[in-house]
């Protein structure tokens, strides 16, 4: 089994991902969704965590071999980023969603320098907005952001367009298409539910109709 399928299976097994097309979840945006993802759960499972961190290292070495600092997004990207930086013997920093309103007002915590080549770690890509704000924060300090690496993406068109417009490569360990295929093969969903899940990816507002 390749890495993308293996990680998709792990996410389903440990219930980091729930698929519920007939009883959709409500996202913070108000969107009714057949999927809910909480990749923080992966940190509680050592074997899953190791599989993910080794996957991150492999993808970074393959796609961004010139990296010289790892950053995590606050908060979900911090633990993964710190482990990866340790495995790769690289400096680590993390990026807040906004600058602190006290102290020295840092948005990036850790020692960073203009000219560094950074890879940013995220756990989940939905619209891509929050991690691309982290990219902008790093770039504003003269850092070259080589790309973003995440555990999982919903593969929404809005996110893919946002990364293209920002000219930032996105690499993920697994993705929505892979996950729903694995879910069907392993009996997590029925054929009818698979149809609904595919419709959601294409049209988040009208997939239930």
Swiss-Prot record:
Keywords assigned: Glycosyltransferase, Magnesium, Pyrimidine biosynthesis, Transferase
Amino acids binding 5-phospho-alpha-D-ribose 1-diphosphate: 96, 100, 102, 122-130
EC number: 2.4.2.10
Catalyzed chemical reaction(s): orotidine 5'-phosphate + diphosphate = orotate + 5-phospho-alpha-D-ribose 1-diphosphate
Recorded metabolic or biological pathway in which this protein acts: Pyrimidine metabolism; UMP biosynthesis via de novo pathway; UMP from orotate: step 1/2
Cofactor: Mg(2+)
An annotated GO BP: 'de novo' UMP biosynthetic process
GO MF term set: magnesium ion binding; orotate phosphoribosyltransferase activity
Functional note: Catalyzes the transfer of a ribosyl phosphate group from 5-phosphoribose 1-diphosphate to orotate, leading to the formation of orotidine monophosphate (OMP).
Similarity comment text for this entry: Belongs to the purine/pyrimidine phosphoribosyltransferase family. PyrE subfamily.
NCBIfam families: pyrE
Protein name as it appears in the record: Orotate phosphoribosyltransferase
Source organism per UniProt: Streptococcus agalactiae serotype Ia (strain ATCC 27591 / A909 / CDC SS700)
Species lineage: Bacteria, Bacillati, Bacillota, Bacilli, Lactobacillales
């Amino acid at each position: 089994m390749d890495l993308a399928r293996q990680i998709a299976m792990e996410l389903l097994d440990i219930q980091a991902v729930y698929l519920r097309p007939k009883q959709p979840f409500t996202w913070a945006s108000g969107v009714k969704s057949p999927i809910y993802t909480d990749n923080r759960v992966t940190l509680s499972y050592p074997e899953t965590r190791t599989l993910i961190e080794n996957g991150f290292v492999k993808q970074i070495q393959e796609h961004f071999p010139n990296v010289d600092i790892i950053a995590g997004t606050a908060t979900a990207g911090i633990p993964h980023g710190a482990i990866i930086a340790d495995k790769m013997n690289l400096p680590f920093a993390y990026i807040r969603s906004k600058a602190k309103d006290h102290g020295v007002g840092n948005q990036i915590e850790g020692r960073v320098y203009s000219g560094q080549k950074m890879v940013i770690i995220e756990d989940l890509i939905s619209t891509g907005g929050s991690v691309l704000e982290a990219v902008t924060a790093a770039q504003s300090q003269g850092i070259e952001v080589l790309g973003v690496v995440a555990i999982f993406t919903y593969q929404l068109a809005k996110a893919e367009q946002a990364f293209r417009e920002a000219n930032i490569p996105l690499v993920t360990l697994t993705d929505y298409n892979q996950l729903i295929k694995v879910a069907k093969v392993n009996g997590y969903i029925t054929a009818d539910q698979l149809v609904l899940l595919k419709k959601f990816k294409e049209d988040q507002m009208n997939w239930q109709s």
